[in-house]
Amino acid sequence: MGEFLPTTYEEMKARGWQQPDFVYICGDAYVDHPSFGAAIICRTLESRGFKVCFLSQPDWRDVEAFREFGKPRLAFLISSGNIDSMVNHYTVSKRRRKKDLYTAGGQMGKRPDRAVIVYSQMARQAYKDATIILGGIEASLRRLAHYDYWD
């Protein structure tokens, strides 16, 4: 540990890896700090000897963005980030927010609404037989018997 997690194919290859064990797909910008759950999960896996790559705010309109590292040996780990993507995008009165506090420069539009669903669909489209593990606040809110306030 000590180096940042690979966030590009070139960084993964520089470590001498052919394939990651896990690819963590996150709706937030990459922040390697223990106040971010993604960093804790990735660093814990890394400390156990797993090869973890971090795919931050991939372009959800382009399946090739989800093929950045190739198919992970074990699974895609998918989270919308520190906050539900709908809460991140809209106020309680359903007005669009002006800034994304978990994106560099506060730029809006780097993650889709319902990011966990969209990222999962794109990972599945990229690799039909890949294992997908969901986590985070959004994944826990978007379950089978879920009333979606936004609709």
Predicted regions and their residues:
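A short, Lys/Arg-enriched amphipathic alpha-helix followed by its capping loop at the start of a domain
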Residues: 44-50
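Glycine-rich beta-alpha loop elements in corrinoid/cobalamin-binding modules
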Residues: 10-11, 29, 37, 42, ...
